[in-house]
Swiss-Prot record:
The lineage of its organism: Bacteria, Pseudomonadati, Pseudomonadota, Gammaproteobacteria, Cellvibrionales. This is Acetylxylan esterase / glucomannan deacetylase. InterPro entries: CE2_N, CE2A, CtCE2-like_dom, PCW_deacetylase/CE, SGNH_hydro, SGNH_hydro_sf. Pathway: Glycan degradation; xylan degradation. It is a lipid-anchor. CDD domains: Endoglucanase_E_like (cd01831). It is an enzyme of class 3 (hydrolase). It comes from Cellvibrio japonicus (strain Ueda107).
Length: 358
């Protein structure tokens, strides 16, 4: 009986110590660089010397799974005009505008620790600014193995429509970068329907041979296809071995035809050379050419004809055509609306299923 009190005291001390250790473990912090393998990346990114990631194309997505109560990200936008969507456990997204200076973005904060899946999606496009993700910091137990991407791979090449411009338009509001929403674009919706990962490589206002205003000295599709981000001679060049798509969709031509129907031979010869580059760089890929959603009437008919002759010149059983209906936007903006993007995906998906036998 004399030993009972010391034993109980020792036992109580043990449980108190264990409880404190558990609380300490649950409240500890863990920081990983953006290029850490616990973060799954979809889209073109540039790995910097400090292991951070910089990206500019829309739809770039970074996802991770963690056990903890709070997760933050150190991020910035070079121009302060970029937006991201943050999705926690498949709940509706939260849209966040990034500053030009590095900021701490709180991705989630819960009273209790638990397992959570987190996804960051770049809503904006290159000319809004390049986004840098430096690191993630977790309050909790650990970063778990990263989510696995679908095996099928799609590359979508295009202009502002592919970038998701004006999907989130607001009637009566001056147009701003909040209106872009790559997540709801036809390309990402189509990839989701086909159970595929996707890269959007697109630039608003650009075309195959000229921009919307007729300029020919901008970086148009054959140029910016080669970039990781940016559109100047100093832009990091993309290593095509990093991503070998099964399917490439080229939806270009709206801006080429905006000033008028371009010279037939110039357009077809340029498109033929570019598609040959795609065939060489991606020897296992099927390539689908489409006219996009904005053109109508004579311009649409001319572009469809140019695409047909491009295919004839290539003589390749890997190059196909997919048709697109006219989706004219609304009174707020000529770009397709959110509902029209969904309709575009519904139109495109069965054509691609048949071509790919998916």
């Amino acid at each position: 009986m004399k030993l009972l009190f010391p034993i109980l005291l020792l036992t109580g001390s043990y449980f108190l110590s264990a409880c404190n250790n558990t609380q300490s473990l649950m409240s500890s912090t863990h920081t990983i660089a953006a290029s850490d393998p616990h973060i799954q990346v979809m889209g073109r990114t540039h790995i910097n010397d400090d292991a951070s990631l910089t990206f500019g194309y829309p739809g770039v997505s970074l996802s991770t799974i963690v056990a903890g109560s709070r997760l933050t990200a150190e991020m910035q936008s070079s121009n302060g005009n970029s937006w991201i969507d943050v999705i926690i456990d498949n709940h509706p997204p939260t849209s966040i505008k990034l500053d030009a200076q590095q900021q701490t973005v709180e991705l989630f904060h819960f009273p209790n620790s638990g397992e959570h899946r987190v996804e960051i999606i770049h809503r904006s496009e290159n000319w809004h600014g390049q986004v840098t993700l430096k690191q993630l910091t977790l309050t909790g137990t650990q970063f778990l193995p990263a989510p696995v991407l679908p095996q099928r791979k799609i590359l979508v090449l295009g202009d502002s429509v592919t970038c998701g411009e004006a999907i989130d338009r607001v009637a009566g509001e001056d147009k701003n970068t909040r209106w872009w929403n790559a997540r709801e674009s036809y390309g990402m919706l189509t990839a989701k329907a086909l159970d595929a990962q996707v890269q959007l490589v697109c630039w608003g206002g650009r075309g195959l041979i000229r921009s919307w205003n007729g300029k020919t000295d901008d970086a148009n599709l054959p140029d910016f296809y080669q970039f990781t981000l940016g559109d100047t001679g100093q832009a990091p060049q993309w290593d095509h071995h990093r991503y070998q798509p099964d399917l490439i969709i080229s939806a270009i031509g709206t801006n080429d035809f905006s000033p008028g129907i371009p010279d037939r031979a110039t357009y077809i010869n340029t498109y033929t050379r570019f598609v040959r580059t795609l065939l060489d760089n991606h020897p296992q890929a099927t390539i689908v050419l489409t006219e996009g959603a904005i053109l109508n009437g004579d311009k649409k008919a001319a572009l469809v004809s140019y695409i047909g002759e491009t295919r004839q010149q290539l003589h390749s059983n890997r190059v196909f055509y997919a048709s697109s209906s006219h989706h004219p936007g609304d009174n707020s903006d000529a770009h397709p609306t959110k509902d029209q993007h969904a309709a575009m995906a519904r139109e495109l998906t069965p054509q691609l299923r048949q071509i790919m036998d998916w």
